[in-house]
Amino acid sequence: MRIAYILTSLGIGGAEKQVLALADRMSARGHTVLLLALRARQQQEWPAQVDVVYLNMQKTPVDLVAGALRARRALGAFKPDVVHSHTYPANMLARMMGLCGAAPRVISTIHNVYEGGRLRMLTYRWTDLLVCHTTAVSTAAAERFIRLKAVPREKCGVLTNGIDTGEFTPDTPRREAMRTQLGAGNDFIWLAAGRITEAKDYPNLIRAFEQVQDTMHETQLWIAGETAAGSRSSDREEPGCFRLKASSSEHDRVRLLGLRRDMPTLLDAADGFVLSSAWEGMPLVIGEAMSMEKPVVATDVGGVRELLGDTGSIVRAKDSAALAAAMLEAMRRPAAGRAMAGRAARQRILRYFSIDSKAAEWEKLYQSLL
């Protein structure tokens, strides 16, 4: 098959990483693959192993039209059998390409429970005739879009994210080296990861960690993620006061690590992973932590429950006391018990969420449309 993937950018993010992993797997399975990125090439990107066309679509009307024309030319030359788009901007462009005949079969994928307000939901509904199928990365996301009438139930399915279990495999020497580099000592290290945005609700995590510190002092919190430019904030403290708190003497055990490309190594070095999000789709990093055999404490958002099953702790969103209690419970568990739970988590990923099994599912869906 000839498969074209359309995504907003190749920037460092979970959805982008998932699309690139899928593109690589499809290429390895003998298909011809092309990537179209709406934005221009960025300074920080995931590396692509397949051909990429950058559409350079900025927010001005001229740039948007020029980018759409570039997309039409690229798809016209490539002649795809299937066009698979990811997240709202790319989904709308793919549908436009279907309207003009450049995309014979379009699949749209929704990567979050929340992809915008009422107008976006209406545009999903109005353009649904231009797609063959819509998928969501979690049941929670699919049900919300169906409930809002953005997608009809008969054309919507769930196909979860996949984890590269080869990349995310525990490695003891790597763990020790990173712990030494970052000054972990004998502390229990909690790792959180993701852009510093409203959705991730880091103020909730900081409040929870304060409570953990009141009880167990020999612990650190590492946060890997960049500030997303132009992100909304529901809390006046985010991200400015959050940075101030993290750098103050009161919170000298909170480390802001910035943008990182070495998540397998960071997860190796950590003793547990914590997610404090207010909303999510299907957080890839939780699956990665499970693949690394780490205990996971997470808020009950998006597809978290689908991923974790009974292998981790799930608490209410925006409840720092519950989050702290679950973190403390994980820390108090004997090391042997944590190790056993970690192995069970990895087995769950291997059985249900490996990227290779997901690639096979996608391939089957593509073939069903031909």
Language-model regions, residue ranges each:
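Conserved acidic donor-binding segment of nucleotide-sugar-dependent glycosyltransferases
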Residues: D310-S320, E329-A335
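Short hydrophobic beta-strand element within catalytic cores of glycosyltransferases
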Residues: L36, I286, P295-A298
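Nucleotide-activated donor-binding/catalytic signature segment of Leloir-type glycosyltransferases, i.e.
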Residues: S234-G258
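N-terminal strand-loop element at the rim of the active site
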Residues: Y5-A66, A229
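A short helix/loop element that forms part of the nucleotide-sugar donor recognition site in Leloir-type
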Residues: T169-A184, E238-F242, A336
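A conserved mid-protein helix/loop that constitutes part of the nucleotide-sugar donor-binding site
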Residues: E16-A21, F188-Q211, L221, A321
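Aromatic "clamp/platform" in nucleotide-sugar-dependent glycosyltransferases that forms part
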Residues: L259, A278
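A conserved, positively charged/aromatic
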Residues: I107-V137, E143, K149
